[in-house]
Amino acid sequence: PSAGHGALSAPLSDFTVMIEQASIFTAGPPLVKASLGEDITKEELGGPEIALHSGVIHNLARNDESALEQIRTWLSYLPSSAWQVPTRLADAEGKRKVNEILDIIPENPRQAYDMHDVINAVADSGSVFTIQPMFGQSLITCFARLSGRPVAIVANQPQHMAGSITVEAADKATQFIQVADSFHLPLIFLTDNPGVLAGSSSEKAGILRHAGRMFLAQHHATVPKIQVTLRKAYGFGSTAMGMNPFDGQTLNLAFPGVSFGAMPAKGADDATGADQETRKALREAELSSGYRSASSLSIDDIIDPSDTRNMLLQGLEIASSR
C-alpha cells in the first residue's frame, strides 16, 4: 500500500503502473475508520478498481516483472532526455495501403466501431502501447510507431459514449499531450466525435473547464500535429482535437463524407424549430461540409481512407524537413 505523501507521487508522475495486489490512498483504513467512522478495506479504498478508474494510476500489471516491462516499453518511445529527440527505429515498415479501414468503419455514421482497430491498422505492426485504458474511455491515448518513428496518438473511441469528450477523457488527454510535447513526440489526432459531452451532469462536473484545458494543451504543443477526421467532428469537440487551422498543425485531413459544424443538423433544426424545407437543407449542407471546408483551406485534403498511413508518414516527413 501507498498512503499520504508517498501516494502523492503517483498523480504527479508522467506514467504510473500498479500491480493487482497494490493499493493507494490519501489515508489508510485505520485512519479513515478513526476520523470518518467508515469501515473499509484497503482494496475498497484504493485498490486497482478504484485507482485505475479514477485516473490516479495509468496502467495495471499482473506482478512486479510485468510492471517493469511496461515501464521499459513506455520509455522505449522517448528520448534519453527532454533535450533530445526520440530515436527512429531502423529497418521499419514503410508506406503501405490500409484497405482494412474500409471494413472497420461502418457506412452508417451512427454505428459504433472500435478505434483500436483503426490505430492498429495504421501503426507499425505490434507498436501500439495504450496508456490509461480504464480511465476516460471515450478517448484513446497511446504511443505507437509510424515507419519506426515514435508518435503519440489521441483518438476518439466511438464504442464508448460515441467518442464524446468527457471530463475524464479531457483530463487524460491533457496530461498525455503535455508529456508527448515535453519529449518531442509528434501528435496524431484521429477524430470522430459528436462534440464535448453535454448535459447537466457534465456541466456540474466542469466539462467546459476540463475541455478548455485539453484545448490549451494541444494548442500550446510545439511538436508536429496531424489531425484526421474519420466521420464527424462537432462544436468544441473538433477544436479540442486539433482540427482548426489557426492551431498551427502540420497537416489537417479528412475522409470523404465527413460532417462538420457547430452541432449536428438534427440538433440544429430541433433547436431552431426549423420547417421541413430548412431541415432538408441542413441535412444536405451537413453531408457536403467536408468538401466545403476543404475548399476554404481549413482541411488540407480529403483522402482515401486506405491512404491514411501513407498520408501520416508524408506529414511526418514534411515536419522533419522544417
Say what each PLM segment does.
Residues 1-322:
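Ligand-binding clefts of soluble mixed alpha/beta catalytic domains
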